[in-house]
A protein has these predicted regions:
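Short C-terminal tail/terminal secondary-structure segment
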Residues: 2-4, 98, 149, 226, ...
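Canonical Rossmann dinucleotide-binding motif of NAD(H)/NADP(H)-dependent dehydrogenases/reductases
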Residues: 2-36
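The beta1-alpha1 cofactor-binding region of Rossmann-like NAD(H)/NADP(H)-dependent oxidoreductases
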Residues: 43-44, 62-73, 106, 219-220
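Substrate-binding pocket helix/loop in short-chain dehydrogenase/reductase
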Residues: 98-101, 105-110, 195, 206
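Catalytic Tyr-X3-Lys loop
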Residues: 102-121, 136, 140, 164, ...
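Active-site helix of classical SDR
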Residues: 124, 160, 168
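Alpha-helical segment proximal to the catalytic Tyr-Lys
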Residues: 129, 173-177, 234
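Residue(s) in the substrate-gating loop at a strand-loop-helix junction
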Residues: 144
Length: 250
């Protein structure tokens, strides 16, 4: 599968792109000839990512929950590269975990929703006008298996990812005739930096539900993402791809 089938090198914005899944995806797309713009709140990690990926990688310190900052960063990418072909929303936080719903802190719940849900909408609304003018675009939102099935002790995260799946269904239908596809991906546990801060009991709880009895890898995620955002993936929209080792079969 080759994303360079477009007339010119595709330009991809990747939120949460300085580390974890976002960076793994960026590495793969760059190898395939894409130009990438990484949005992240960690400036030090952004600079490191830019050095490793090389020029002409674009980086911007952005809180995706900040609508104004997102808009400015997207316009800077469009000015730098002349187009935006791909949007991959990887930025996300788990919030507090291993807590029952009646004990959930509302401030933390709202913070997770702002980043995980509003963040996807903020970038989508800033990028899609560019895609509409081009009559082409690929949007991929990162959901989670917890958004499909719910993980006990993770109310904020599970709720936010269920919302992302719902958003994807709506957007897929709304833009189906425009040349823009909008899809989501729902991984189970993937070994990334975010899981190093989760309690071991929570990781075991999630891994035990996977029939393959293992975590997924960043390379496995990057491989399927490459296809979803490619020109070849032209007849699938509003869909949530699973990457769950057999945990979800629907």
């Amino acid at each position: 599968m080759n994303i360079t089938n477009t007339p010119t090198s595709p330009v991809a914005i990747i939120t949460g792109g300085a580390g974890g899944l976002g960076f793994a995806i960026a590495e793969r797309l760059v190898r395939k000839g894409a130009r990438v713009a990484l949005f992240d709140f960690n400036e030090e990690a952004l600079q490191k990512a830019q050095r490793e990926l090389g020029e002409p990688t674009f980086v911007a310190k952005v809180d995706v929950a900040d609508r104004t900052a997102v808009g400015l960063a997207v316009e800077a990418v469009a000015e730098a590269f002349g187009r935006i072909n791909i949007l991959i929303n990887c930025a996300g936080i788990t919030g507090y975990t291993n807590i029952k719903s009646h004990e959930v802190d509302l401030e933390d719940f709202n913070r997770v929703m702002r980043v995980n849900v509003n963040g996807c909408l903020n970038t989508f609304q800033a990028v899609v006008p560019h895609m509409l003018r081009q009559e082409y675009g690929r949007v991929l939102h990162f959901a989670s298996i917890s958004g499909k099935e719910g993980n006990a002790g993770m109310l904020a995260y599970s709720t936010s990812k269920a919302a992302v799946i719902g958003m994807t269904k709506v957007q897929g239908k709304e833009y189906a005739g425009t040349g823009i596809t909008v899809n989501a991906i729902a991984p189970a546990v993937i070994l990334t930096e975010i899981h190093t801060i989760m309690p071991e009991a929570q990781i075991k709880y999630m891994t035990d539900k996977i029939p393959m009895k293992r975590c997924g890898t960043k390379d496995e995620v990057a491989a399927i993402v490459e296809f979803i955002v490619s020109p070849e993936a032209s007849f699938t929209t509003g869909f949530t791809f699973d990457l769950s080792g057999g945990r979800a079969t629907y």
